[in-house]
Curated annotation (Swiss-Prot):
Family: In the N-terminal section; belongs to the lyase 1 family. Argininosuccinate lyase subfamily.
Pathway where it operates: Amino-acid biosynthesis; L-arginine biosynthesis; N(2)-acetyl-L-ornithine from L-glutamate: step 1/4; Amino-acid biosynthesis; L-arginine biosynthesis; L-arginine from L-ornithine and carbamoyl phosphate: step 3/3
Gene this protein is translated from: argHA
Catalytic activities: 2-(N(omega)-L-arginino)succinate = fumarate + L-arginine; L-glutamate + acetyl-CoA = N-acetyl-L-glutamate + CoA + H(+)
Taxonomic source organism: Moritella profunda
Other noteworthy facts: In bacteria which possess the bifunctional enzyme ornithine acetyltransferase/N-acetylglutamate synthase (ArgJ), ArgA fulfills an anaplerotic role.
EC number assigned by the record: 4.3.2.1, 2.3.1.1
Name listed for the protein in its UniProt record: Bifunctional protein ArgHA
Amino acid sequence: MALWGGRFSQAADARFKNFNDSLRFDYRLAEQDITGSVAWSKALVSVGILTQDEQLTIEAALNDLKLAVLENPEQILQSDAEDIHSWVETQLIAKVGDLGKKLHTGRSRNDQVATDLKLWCKQQGEQLLMQLDKTQQQLVSLAREHQHTVLPGYTHLQRAQPVTFSHWCLAYVEMLERDFSRLTDCLKRLDTCPLGSGALAGTAYPMDRTELAHTLGFASATLNSLDSVSDRDHVMELMSTASMSMIHLSRLAEDLIFYNSGESNFIELADAVTSGSSLMPQKKNPDALELIRGKTGRVFGSLSAMLMTLKALPLAYNKDMQEDKEGLFDALDTWSDCLEMAAMSLVGMKINEERTKEAALGGYSNATELADYLVAKGVPFRDSHHIVGEAVVAAIAKGVPLEALTLAEFKAFDVLIEDDVYHHLSLDETLAKRKAQGGVSPVQVEFALTNAEKRLEERDTSGISIRAAR
């Protein structure tokens, strides 16, 4: 049943109907549409459109419909309704007769869909907060387990300075913390209720929109009806947050793919998140991580499409805005799936500590320590940098690490070098010196790890829904 047939003398062309209808994707808003309709029925009592008994009849029918939808949402797709709003109204009328025709009084699909979408974003956003938290918890657990596991640090994919596996884990904990903060901010900004804004000019019925907003769990009502039905900032913000987080997940995936390679041999991923080859029986491929990396572009694409769709749209509602849902659903579904796979990939991962230490000792990654050693002896850093560069060339020519050069060979580069240089070039000393806040020294890693554990432990997730939006 179309909700707008009276103006037209001819039926819509079937091809146009197929092009125009949105039920095939906005059916995912069924639960939110029903929830909004129950709240609207209560508001209609306050302005004398429905009696209390009529409202209770409508609410009971809508609640029955919601239960049926939650049990089998795909049943909706068997209908030829234009959209989820039409489907819900048709089902309600089938249950309660002409009484159901009163429900849409004073309401437009414009404020209705804006409300449905915000309700969906709130629910799905809260679920994503839980998933971010879970991934952080897994990283922190791994960091605690491998607090003293040495790992080569890289710049330009060249070994640069030694770090620890714990320090590496905590780097991604910080990235996901920013994602958590961004998502929290998004959810705060979208926590306003558009219902009661009508098509664009506001409803003609003097209901209390603040009470209506609170009934639906929003912090407040929106302040401008024209903006309310036009606003899709929350869609773009959530997609932007998803895109930023996917960058972090993609970098995590790429690091682990590199560490898992035969050339690095730093880690071995669990069988549960890898697959094999149809031809090469020896292969164990990091497919979960590669898909995280690959799906990142998919999320970026959804954001880009949404930005282009809304650019230069006139106020208020335009049919272009129907394009907000598929990209949003796909972007947040993809982000959710990738968070789950990232957390799973960290479980059961074996770390080859001997190999990571061997790699950390190679590549002359203690060269900076020799430069700092000379600085402590009074040599200007720029001069010490040049001296150490020459020493590295000599060590490479000899085929030995820096610390294998003899004292006489060191003194050929600078007479200030003494026996204590070997202590300064040791791996333990290299790590221990990085004791400024945020550094890789054991003291600072313990400090950062303890703070991360405390932060996650004290995080209040009690008000977060544990059920994802469909």
